[in-house]
């Protein structure tokens, strides 16, 4: 069998508290102390739920409540306690005399959370927020040049060395190798879209057994 409700809600006032109701609640708690919230409304003569009386006292009427803005010291305590307890506002309020759990929760959501985000701190984990790394696209020819500097030059020079005749005499084979060297040079230029005029000039057969 479940727990019975603390009051008959059909006959309860649900609007704003009046000054007379506040004073009745204050006088009763001063004389009898806090507690027994379920039976309190009937004892005081209030058409209010026991939970409503408790929240009214804790959040608005108790004499030790602090009014006004949170101090820097209180804010630091809230941040530290939140890193330990998370959103357990009642535990945090227990360490801050005069502040209510509802008041602390509202201040966290409207002020502190935004401040932490502006400082690059995750309000949930209290760790640094890591920005995702962005990847940029590089064309294939630029990627080759940056990854293997000088590789294009090495390929050119190797091709030219193969053009040189070991006999020292211009032969049909020399001419064929020279044409082949020019073809590979131009073909590599088109493939990588490189400007070969920067530092290198197109290969031409100039002298006997030489390729420049």
From Swiss-Prot:
Q: Which residues bind DNA?
A: 37-61, 89-112
Q: Which GO terms describe its molecular function?
A: DNA binding
Q: Where in the cell is it found?
A: Nucleus
What PROSITE patterns is this protein classified in? HTH_MYB (PS51294)
InterPro entries associated with the record: Homeodomain-like_sf, Myb_dom, Myb_TF_plants, SANT/Myb
Q: Name one Pfam family in it.
A: Myb_DNA-binding
- Any one cellular component term from GO for this entry? nucleus
Query: Could you tell me which residue ranges the HTH myb-type domain spans?
Result: 9-61, 62-116
> Does the record carry Aminoacyl-tRNA synthetase as a key word?
no
Family annotation (SUPFAM superfamilies): Homeodomain-like (SSF46689)
Q: Which UniProt keywords apply?
A: Activator, DNA-binding, Nucleus, Repeat, Transcription, Transcription regulation
Purpose of the protein: Transcription activator.
PANTHER family of this UniProt entry? F14D16.11-RELATED
Protein's recorded name: Transcription factor MYB8
Organism in which the protein naturally occurs: Arabidopsis thaliana
């Amino acid at each position: 069998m479940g727990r019975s409700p603390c009051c008959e809600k059909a006959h309860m006032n649900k609007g704003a508290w009046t000054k007379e109701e506040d004073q009745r609640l204050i006088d009763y708690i001063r004389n009898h102390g806090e507690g027994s919230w379920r039976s309190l409304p009937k004892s005081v003569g209030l058409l209010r739920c026991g939970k409503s009386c408790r929240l009214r006292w804790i959040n608005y009427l108790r004499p030790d409540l602090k009014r006004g803005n949170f101090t820097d010291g209180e804010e630091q305590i809230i941040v530290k306690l939140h890193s330990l307890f998370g959103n357990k506002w009642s535990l945090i309020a227990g360490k801050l005399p005069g502040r209510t759990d509802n008041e602390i929760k509202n201040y966290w959501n409207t002020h502190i959370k935004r401040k932490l985000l502006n400082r690059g701190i995750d309000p949930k984990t209290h760790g640094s927020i890591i920005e995702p790394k962005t990847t940029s696209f590089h064309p294939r020819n630029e990627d080759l040049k940056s990854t293997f500097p000088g590789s294009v030059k090495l390929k050119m020079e190797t091709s030219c060395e193969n053009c040189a005749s070991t006999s020292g005499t211009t032969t049909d084979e020399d001419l064929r190798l020279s044409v082949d060297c020019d073809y590979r040079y131009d073909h590599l230029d088109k493939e990588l879209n490189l400007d070969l005029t920067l530092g290198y000039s197109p290969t031409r057969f100039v002298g006997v057994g030489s390729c420049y």
